[in-house]
Curated annotation (Swiss-Prot):
Species whose genome carries this gene: Neoponera apicalis (Ant)
Function summary: Has a broad spectrum of activity against both Gram-positive and Gram-negative bacteria and S.cerevisiae. Has insecticidal and hemolytic activities. May act by disrupting the integrity of the bacterial cell membrane.
Localization per Swiss-Prot or TrEMBL: Secreted; Target cell membrane
Protein name: U1-poneritoxin-Na1a
Organism domain of life: Eukaryota
GO molecular function terms attached to this record: toxin activity
InterPro entries for the chain: Antimicrobial_4 (IPR012523)
Length: 24
């Protein structure tokens, strides 16, 4: 379960960082 969460997080992280950079 934890491994699955980390895989999902690894996929979402770049998108979240991209959105955060666009806002600044």
């Amino acid at each position: 379960f934890l491994g699955g969460l980390m895989k999902i997080g690894a996929k979402l992280l770049p998108s979240v960082i991209g959105l955060f950079k666009k806002k600044q």
